[in-house]
Every structure is written in C-alpha cells, then in structure tokens.
C-alpha cells in the first residue's frame, strides 16, 4: 500500500463484521478514496433463523454511516450456488469433505466481487483477511498474516496473480486483539461482534441437519477395525475422517472406555470404519493429490517444504514429488492425523504460501 496514489479508489468487502469494519477505517485514515460493497451469497429460509444477512447488512450500514463512505450492495446468491455450493454437494455425495470457503474466495470474493468492484470504478479491493501480499521480481506473493492464530493464507492459496495484484489485506500486519481495540475506540457496533464460524449458509444449525435437506439418507454399517458390526449410520456424507462427536456409540463396544473416532470411509461397501482412542489407523505419512496450483512459477520437484492439511494446523515438514500423471505425492516427516480426502493441502516456504492441491487418498 505504500506505493499507492492517494487518489486510488479502494472498495472494501464489508461483511458487517469487525475485521472488515476496521479495514475500511484504516484505509480511510491513510487518505484513500474508500467505498464499501456488501455482498449477499445465500438466500435465507423464510423464517430467517439461520443466516444473519439482514443483521450483517444493518451493521455494515451503521459502519458506513459512521465513516461517511458510500455503501454498495450486490446479491451473488446465484453465482455462489453455481460456482461453490453445487461443487460442495457433489463432493459430499462422493463421501468426501470439501472446503467451500477456499472455492468461495477464488470464485466469489476475489472473482465475482472483484469484477463488480472494478465496474464501480475501483482500482483495488480490500478485505479483512489476515494475510499479506508482497511483490518480488515482478510477481505477487501471498504471505502469512503476522497473527499466527488468525492467519488465513490457507483459504487464499488459489488466488491468481491478477487477483493478488488487485487486492489489499490491511490487517495482515496486525492482530485480532488490536483490531477489536481499534473498533472499540471508534465506537463501532461490530467491536464485540462474534467472529463468524463455519459456513455462512449453515449458520447455527447442526451440519448434519443442514446436509440432510439436500442429500438423501443412505443407511449403512458402522464397523470396527476388524470389520465387526457396531451400529448403522444414515449416510457417509454425514461423517468426516477424525470425527468424534455424533457417533453415539454406547459403552457395550470396545475394550476400553476411550472415545470412538472415524478412521475411514469405505465407499464401495457404504461402511464407516471407527476406532478407539489415538489409534494408528488415524495416522498416515503419505497422501496423493489432484489439481495442484502454484501461486508463482511451479517449483522443481521433488522438493522439501512445509504444509498444512487443515486450517490452523502447525506447518509440517514434507517432501513433494510428482507421479506419472503429473499429480503430487506428499510424504510427511511425521505421520499426520485425520488426513481427509476432499480437503486442501497448502504448501509453504517459511512465511510464503506457495500454493496447494486437493487431497485425494492416503
């Protein structure tokens, strides 16, 4: 941002939360021409019990009124359904566990949103993500946010050079505590607003309850590591690798009182394999991927780097190689717990996010 002209028009993705509120304030204080754009990505149910779009819009209006900046609104519900949600459902039907937030960033927040912002005259867009962008040798790099607990580069690893060139992350060099303090000092209604968790279209519902409205139940067996029948499940889509909560396996099974976890899904037999405690079947040292994406020039393989198989995981050392189909094979230095097909593995070189791929199998 240091090299930007003060006449630069920046449109902030204002969600009605504290992070985007402070983002708008910081840019305004730096003298830029700031406007805001609130986007709606999901049509609520008639009772409005789950989605908070109305309240979020009200909070966004409150912030823009306080800052005396213009607020635009746009409905991307159709785009979200076509580009994100349909893929989400297809993956769950296959028994996989997708991450819609990553696709939403690529297709909606830095896709449809960016395009619309430019049509409104924006030179750049800004969001409240905790990440950083650097330019080196004529190309843009995605860097981790300085607040390790809030770093969101994992969700942004599919951004293109063009998307990075048009984006700003003012919160990348700050931390959440300071952001809330700034919001409080400026009397923002969002100062103490709870951070959004989970997926926007699910809201406060149980995930299985939401999924059941779109996917038919398909009863199968829950079995132990030796194939012994334990109970029935209502569909593999309602479970994910490593899951503990919701299995509801009583005390009449197993040799100990240790909790049960999902270790595997057998799609062909429609079986859910469960184990007790910190079982070895929960750990794998290798995985294979599809759809590799590199933010900058693809590296020479094989190579050693760090990787994360889920958000907020501590980076893990690994070796990346390429198979005959040009897909990536990952070997970790240490076995990893609950490697989950459909999720993303994201690669790092210290604080630089290199890119990522989709986990296919272990």
UniProtKB/Swiss-Prot annotation:
Keywords assigned: ATP-binding, Cytoplasm, Disulfide bond, Nucleotide-binding, RNA-binding, Transferase, tRNA processing, tRNA-binding
Pfam families xref list: tRNA_Me_trans, tRNA_Me_trans_C, tRNA_Me_trans_M
Entry's EC annotation: 2.8.1.13
Interaction with tRNA as annotated region, ranges: 150-152, 310-311
InterPro entries: MnmA-like (IPR004506), MnmA-like_C (IPR046885), MnmA-like_central (IPR046884), MnmA-like_central_sf (IPR023382), Rossmann-like_a/b/a_fold (IPR014729)
Disulfides per UniProt: 104-200
SUPFAM superfamilies the UniProt entry points to: Adenine nucleotide alpha hydrolases-like
Localization terms from the record: Cytoplasm
Catalytic reaction equation(s): S-sulfanyl-L-cysteinyl-[protein] + uridine(34) in tRNA + AH2 + ATP = 2-thiouridine(34) in tRNA + L-cysteinyl-[protein] + A + AMP + diphosphate + H(+)
Alphabetical GO biological process terms: tRNA wobble position uridine thiolation
A GO MF label: tRNA-uridine 2-sulfurtransferase activity
Region annotation Interaction with target base in tRNA: where it falls in the sequence: 99-101
A GO CC term attached to the entry: cytoplasm
Amino-acid positions noted as binding ATP in the UniProt annotation, renumbered to this chain: 13-20, 39, 128
Main subcellular location: cytoplasm
Enzyme class (EC, first level): transferase
Recorded family membership: Belongs to the MnmA/TRMU family.
Function: Catalyzes the 2-thiolation of uridine at the wobble position (U34) of tRNA, leading to the formation of s(2)U34.
Name of the protein in question: tRNA-specific 2-thiouridylase MnmA
Organism listed in the record: Vesicomyosocius okutanii subsp. Calyptogena okutanii (strain HA)
């Amino acid at each position: 941002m240091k090299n930007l002209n003060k006449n630069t028009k920046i449109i902030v993705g204002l969600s009605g939360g504290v992070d985007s509120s402070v983002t708008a304030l910081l840019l305004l204080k730096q003298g830029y021409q700031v406007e805001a754009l609130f986007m709606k990505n999901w049509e609520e149910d008639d009772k409005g019990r789950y989605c908070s779009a109305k309240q979020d819009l009200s909070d966004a209006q409150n912030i823009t009124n306080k800052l005396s900046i213009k607020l635009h609104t746009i409905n991307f519900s159709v785009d979200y359904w076509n580009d994100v949600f349909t893929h989400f459902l297809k993956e769950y039907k296959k028994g996989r566990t997708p991450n819609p937030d990553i696709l939403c960033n690529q297709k909606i927040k830095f896709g449809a949103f960016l395009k619309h912002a430019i049509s409104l005259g924006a030179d750049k867009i800004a969001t409240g993500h905790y990440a950083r962008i650097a330019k080196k040798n004529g190309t843009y790099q995605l860097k981790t946010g300085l607040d390790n607990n809030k770093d969101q580069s994992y969700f942004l690893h599919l951004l293109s050079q063009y998307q990075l060139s048009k984006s700003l992350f003012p919160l990348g060099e700050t931390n959440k505590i300071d952001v809330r303090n700034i919001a409080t000092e400026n009397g923002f209604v969002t100062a103490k607003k709870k951070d959004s968790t989970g997926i926007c279209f699910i809201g406060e519902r149980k995930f299985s309850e939401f999924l059941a409205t779109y996917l038919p139940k398909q009863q199968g067996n829950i079995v132990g590591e030796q194939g012994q029948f334990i109970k029935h499940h209502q569909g593999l889509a309602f479970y994910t690798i490593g899951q503990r909560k919701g299995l509801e396996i009583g005390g009449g099974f197993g040799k100990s009182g240790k909790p049960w976890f999902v270790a595997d899904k057998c799609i062909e037999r429609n079986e859910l394999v469960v184990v007790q405690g910190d079982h070895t079947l929960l750990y794998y040292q290798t995985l294979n991927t599809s759809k590799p994406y590199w933010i900058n020039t693809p590296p020479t393989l094989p190579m050693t780097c760090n990787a994360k198989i889920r958000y907020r995981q501590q980076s893990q050392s690994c070796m990346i190689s390429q198979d005959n189909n040009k897909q990536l094979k990952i070997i970790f230095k240490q076995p990893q717990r609950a490697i989950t097909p459909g999720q993303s593995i994201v690669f790092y070189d210290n604080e630089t996010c290199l890119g990522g791929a989709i986990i296919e199998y272990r």
